[in-house]
Amino acid sequence: MISPFLLLAIGTCFASSLVPEKEKDPKYWRDQAQQTLKNALRLQTLNTNVAKNVIMFLGDGMGVSTVTAARILKGQLHHSPGEETKLEMDKFPYVALSKTYNTNAQVPDSAGTATAYLCGVKANEGTVGVSAATQRSQCNTTQGNEVTSILRWAKDAGKSVGIVTTTRVNHATPSASYAHSADRDWYSDNEMPPEALSQGCKDIAYQLMHNIKDIEVIMGGGRKYMFPKNRTDVEYELDEKARGTRLDGLNLIDIWKSFKPKHKHSHYVWNRTDLLALDPHSVDYLLGLFEPGDMQYELNRNNATDPSLSEMVEMAIRILNKNPKGFFLLVEGGRIDHGHHEGKAKQALHEAVEMDQAIGQAGAMTSVEDTLTVVTADHSHVFTFGGYTPRGNSIFGLAPMVSDTDKKPFTAILYGNGPGYKVVGGERENVSMVDYAHNNYQAQSAVPLRHETHGGEDVAVFAKGPMAHLLHGVHEQNYIPHVMAYAACIGANRDHCASASSSGSPSPGPLLLLLALLPLGSLF
């Protein structure tokens, strides 16, 4: 057995050989730092324009360790060592931290957090679009405790609005933008208890079609929740799990169509080919449901039937951008979270790289002069990578050392808990005997669990565009939509823009200095 110290020494020598020649010259690092300093000094001139458009990218489960690992993967996919690569979100000038806890949970879930960063109030885990006065699964605690989202505020201000996700369109993140539910799992009436139905609560898919009837763009998965129970799916005709789920017999696609004005052009599509064939200039309303449940992982995506997140974002912006009053767009890279829960780090990180591609696509189609873009996560995961790996080491590769106890190697990527806890012959599995580069390889975990869990640490918030500087420190997660609304002059922040306009000011700037100087605690 090779000594772990020898392995570390070999790894260190190997790392030295991977150092790019230009990085050996101190001038390279000094010039880079000076350029970064110049860029930072230019930020002294604040962008206080009104945000005509607001785009929010939500990487579900995209904690800081996931961001870093995705950065390395992006670089390695382009044949570089990876560590020096810049994600699109890395280029944003303003970065903050968001405290993710729910009102009743130290380590949060995606529903309570979605209510925070979309509706501006913290809530209990498992609930969407309601205050903390609503208890999970208790329908009778819902009425009177509903809270509205920034999507609603934007719609009320005359803007176009859109939702794009790689999960079901009635999943936790998107549902908080339009629904009010005591339970995030009430996807259709089939998932609701009889008591909740008898008390008048509606399932989330029903609320999607009825609560805000004029959402211009809705794209993601979740077809089966829109159709009567046992209705055969258009794509997976022989798959019983893909069949319709609704007990009330409603066809929500038909209902969606019936709500649209006759003089407007509405389109429902279920595959990539039909989506890309659309002329966005002749589309007023778009509903795209590309899977019965969640959309496929990016690595598993069928190019004929499944659009990428980038493609959906491009189509959404082309449709929404026609409104002279602007738009609000929520984009979720939702399957980052699913990959981590399954212990499949490769799936999770490729999802994160694709979301970053979508961020770049949106940036190319908009301007920082009138578009506020915010990128953040709802929570993190117990995902880590380490082990003194050398520069350029495959992010999915082995660490250059072995365990002090069982003398076996380990991958750089590990989970604190999850399904990757493998015991073979009474001992930890020897990862050198398995294909740890496989797309569905489950990285080893310290504690055996069927599903890996969320993490409780703060997550990053990246921002660019009008008023992005208001995201500048450590904030409660529910602060985020208040900033977006202030920048766009919508919701509770309309009055200050009206007064600024009447006084001849072109932006919400008059209150800016006051906001910047006040301690965060005095604002909420």
From Swiss-Prot:
Binding-site positions, Mg(2+): 60, 173, 332
Keywords associated with the record: Biomineralization, Calcium, Cell membrane, Disulfide bond, Glycoprotein, GPI-anchor, Hydrolase, Lipoprotein, Magnesium, Membrane, Metal-binding, Mitochondrion, Phosphoprotein, Signal, Zinc
Residue pairs linked by disulfide bridges in the UniProt entry: 139-201, 489-497
Membrane topology category: Lipid-anchor; GPI-anchor
Record PTM Phosphoserine, positions in chain: 110
EC number: 3.1.3.1, 3.9.1.1
Post-translational modification summary for this protein: N-glycosylated.
Domain of life, per lineage: Eukaryota
Residues where Zn(2+) 2 binds: 337, 341, 454
Subcellular location: Cell membrane; Extracellular vesicle membrane; Mitochondrion membrane; Mitochondrion intermembrane space
Main location: membrane
Cofactor note: Binds 1 Mg(2+) ion. Binds 2 Zn(2+) ions.
Keyword Phosphoprotein: yes
Active site: 110 (phosphoserine intermediate)
Gene Ontology cellular component terms for the protein in this record: extracellular membrane-bounded organelle; mitochondrial intermembrane space; mitochondrial membrane; plasma membrane; side of membrane
Signal peptide range in chain numbering: 1-17
Binding residue positions for Ca(2+): 235, 290-291, 306
Listed GO biological process terms: biomineral tissue development; bone mineralization; positive regulation of cold-induced thermogenesis
Subunit description: Homodimer.
Record's comment describing the protein's domains: Calcium-binding is structural and does not influence the alkaline phosphatase activity. At very high concentrations, calcium can however substitute for zinc at zinc-binding sites, leading to strongly reduced enzyme activity.
Family, similarity comment: Belongs to the alkaline phosphatase family.
Function: Alkaline phosphatase that metabolizes various phosphate compounds and plays a key role in skeletal mineralization and adaptive thermogenesis. Has broad substrate specificity and can hydrolyze a considerable variety of compounds: however, only a few substrates, such as diphosphate (inorganic pyrophosphate; PPi), pyridoxal 5'-phosphate (PLP) and N-phosphocreatine are natural substrates.
Protein name: Alkaline phosphatase, tissue-nonspecific isozyme
Organism: Bos taurus
Lineage of the species this protein comes from: Eukaryota, Metazoa, Chordata, Craniata, Vertebrata
